[in-house]
From Swiss-Prot:
Keywords: Cytoplasm, Exonuclease, Hydrolase, Nuclease. It comes from Acidothermus cellulolyticus (strain ATCC 43068 / DSM 8971 / 11B). Its EC number is 3.1.11.6. GO terms for molecular function: exodeoxyribonuclease VII activity. This is Exodeoxyribonuclease 7 small subunit. It is an enzyme of class 3 (hydrolase). Belongs to the XseB family. It is found in: Cytoplasm. The keyword Disulfide bond does not apply. It catalyses: Exonucleolytic cleavage in either 5'- to 3'- or 3'- to 5'-direction to yield nucleoside 5'-phosphates.
Amino acid sequence: MTEPPLPHESADDGRARLSYEDARDELIQIVQRLELGGLPLEEALRLWERGEELARVCQAWLDGARARLEAYRAPEQSAANDVSAPGSAEEHDHGR
């Protein structure tokens, strides 16, 4: 089974490949600039659009991280579910 590409590897529209931390840091700077106000409308819109793009990059990284963690946990959870706990219904049925 092959692993899905990392979010920064799937940029098929030519966007720069950013790490989660780089995207997050740039997004924070954009939010701070927008919160200060005083920007011309066109620049504010451009920054907002870039912020939306960066938020999507960050979300893709987080979704990928969650999927990787769940993939590692899945075999452990499956094995734990296969083991009958003491006092389970299965054990009670054998006592009849």
